[in-house]
Amino acid sequence: PPTPTNTPVPPTPTNTPTPTATPTPRPMSLRDDLPAMSLADWPRPAGDNGWGMHFVIDSYPSEEEIDRNIQRMLDMRMKWAVVLYGDEIQLQKLAPRFRDSGIMVIWRKMLRPYEAYYDWGRDIQILKDLGVVPYMQIYNEPSVAQEWPEGQSNQAVFLENLVAATEAVYNAGGYVGLQFVSENWLIDALNLIKQREGEAVFQRMFFIPHSYGMNHPPSYTEDINAVLSFRIFALIFQEQIGFIPPMIVGEGGWKWGATDDGRYPMVNDDLHRDYYVELYSWFRTGMLSNGEPLPDYLFAFCPWLIAHKMDDNAFYDSFAGDRVITIEAIKAIPEFTRRFSWE
């Protein structure tokens, strides 16, 4: 991710020449009948192994594409997924299929950070009516220039959209999923929720880190370009709100052929296999690659990406070929159920 700067983006000039006093922001309007949740209270899939995958990037996939890729995930014993949807019709098409497959989904409405969305409540209700757990990611990589028109990010615009979305998802009984790749933008968002008296949200909020490893080994911790980089965000939550919410890594892992850091070898077929087997084994052994215990807050890791013709991160269908030996090695890991400290 780009290094965030402290230079604010100038607002679009208006025709009002006289400056006005900044109004006191209104407090968030949150229902008061939802219980706070501890880590043990959060829904998880039956036979949970912490293994996941980001689903296809087309937010309007065909039924054939949906079914083919769910089957691939089932063949690899995946229990979690991040799934994009374009509209409520797609949600109604996708949700029952994942429900019936036993895969727990983090739903992500296809939105840019500058786009307000007014149907969070409807979408949460669709999921509830279908018997689907309403894990809902709100926006995606808002600090990244490519998400904005002409690459000009505007944090103030995004934060207003975030507050409105957080309020709507929370009040509908959904689980509020925050996603940031910028540490500063996360801190600013948490502070704004506190300023708006929205702390109740923190007790029903989860975080979706993006933990890409470049060509760094699984144990790498020198900087944020690591599959272990979710630990950096855990420290921020601990400092800012006093605890660490559930985390489901929603993108990340290794790109086949990656050579970003000259100190480390290219991610060839063998390393791709070895790195992913090690990553997914965290949930089996209870130990991270750096020797730390697997934290209870890390619910799942969903690497980028199950399938895409134009993306050499993809496990299937890529121009770079299918990641056959990685897929077979993952399938060969003995079946297990992930254990938490409270069990």
How should these model regions be labeled?
Residues 31-45, 52-63, 261-271, 275, ...:
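Aromatic-rich peripheral "rim/lid" segments of glycoside hydrolase catalytic domains that contact
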Residues 1-44, 343:
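Ser/Thr-rich, Proline-interspersed low-complexity disordered segments
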Residues 107, 190-230, 243-258, 303-308:
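Aromatic- and acid-rich polysaccharide-binding/catalytic face
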Residues 61-89, 133:
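Catalytic domains of carbohydrate-active enzymes, especially glycoside hydrolases
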Residues 170-188, 241-255, 291-306:
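Aromatic-lined carbohydrate-recognition surfaces of secreted/lumenal glycan-active proteins
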Residues 58-73, 116-127:
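Short, acidic/polar
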Residues 51-53, 81-83, 105-108, 134-138, ...:
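Hydrophobic faces of well-ordered beta-strands that scaffold small-molecule active sites
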